[in-house]
Amino acid sequence: MYLEEQNSDLNDEINDLICLSNDLTSLEDRLAVKLKAWNLIPEPKLNWVEPTSSVANGISGVYEEKGDYKVALEWVLLALKAREIEPDASIFCDAGAIYFELGDMENAYKYFQLAYNELRYQPFSYRDRKYWQFYKQRKEELNPKKKTKK
């Protein structure tokens, strides 16, 4: 379900807060505004594909920037849960990056693979190159290319 279809004014208010938060330079200020947007989402929050997934993913991103990967993971998993019926490759890639930073390479690869299957390289293009390098290397290790003889 999309909040915009049920209450477009509230959805616009939440979107305005997210846009405002993205313009702020202080991580603490960005987090405070994103949490304010989160608190405006009607309960049960996970019933709304949007704005729940984008707000939760945005909050996750702030925690990721702060280096608090455990909390970032909690939020990105909420974003994924809200998107169960409509997956989003960019959130898969974000989850992969967080798992990577937590040292959970199995889950990192799993989510990078989901992102790649959906949109190929595109979601990786917004992230540090190390995630793409990891994904390519792990994919090759798991599925070695057969060398052709000339």
Regions from the PLM with identified roles:
Residues 35-42, 77, 113:
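Alpha-solenoid helical repeat scaffolds
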Residues 100-123:
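TPR/TPR-like (Sel1-like) alpha-helical repeat modules
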Residues 12, 29, 47-51, 87, ...:
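Structural signature of alpha-solenoid helical repeat junctions
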Residues 2-8, 39-50, 80-88, 122:
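Flexible helix-coil transition and linker loops at the boundaries of alpha-helical arrays
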Residues 25-28, 67, 103:
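Residue-level detector of the short coil/turn that links helix A to helix B
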